[in-house]
Amino acid sequence: AERTMAANRAAFDRCRIVPRMLRDVSVRDTSVEVLGMKLSSPLLLAPVGILELAHPGADEAVARAAGALGVPYIFSNQASVPMERAAAAMGSTPPLFQLYWSKSRDLVASFVQRAEACGSRAIVVTLDTTLLGWRTRDLDLAYLPFLHGMGIAQYTSDPVFQKLLDENALPAQAVKRRVTLDAVLGLLSMAQRYPGSTWAALRSGRALRAVRQFVGIFSNPALTWADLPFLRQQTRLPILL
């Protein structure tokens, strides 16, 4: 029934801009300091996963726009391009990285180290999606873009994830499926988004295995406060929850 969305909109509707009369506003300064960063305005661009649904180049386009405006961009864990490309597109504007904490601690550590290496100024941990919700519209439409290889570029570009693929390779008979047009189109979509040659990804089955591996480790409903010291050990960056 989307009651949560309605409640969120109602909460924002209750916010009011309070006018202040007879104040000198001939010179206005909207700058603010956040996490040691001097920002020209109190704005950050929030992470949005699978932006390629809007446009194939959307992730980098948003990063370039953020860079041009000097607005920090929290780039998504579920982006369709690696974080390094998004950070490069931002120029001198500082990026932040959204972290979905997966079942693999080694992968979490690798993501954090990559984010730090490409200039991220903070790790923003998403806590409300340790398990996907019961999304009735998505269920009615059989809608999960991850199954088409969308939005998993942080994973397929990561050496730890690639190592997991090698360690957890399925026997040939385990990946057989009935051949249908939808199945062929799904496999092609996965292969086109997998790094390297589309044909090689199809022949090796690696693109399909990557999607299977992602689905198996993405959710981590066991995450608790007790896990946070591990993250603190991986980085000196600020951690936002």
Where are these regions (language model features)?
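An N-cap/entry alpha-helix motif that binds or orients negatively charged groups
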Residues: 1-36, 142-151, 156-218, 222-223
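A short, structure-level motif marking secondary-structure boundaries and short turns
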Residues: 46-48, 96-97, 212-214, 236-238
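A generic secondary-structure micro-motif detector
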Residues: 51-52, 101, 217-218, 239-240
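Conserved phosphate-coordination/catalytic loops
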Residues: 77, 102, 218-225
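Active-site region of glycoside hydrolase catalytic domains
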Residues: 135
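Charged mid-protein connector segments
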Residues: 138-140
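Conserved, well-ordered alpha-helix/loop/beta-strand core segments that scaffold catalytic motifs
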Residues: 223-239
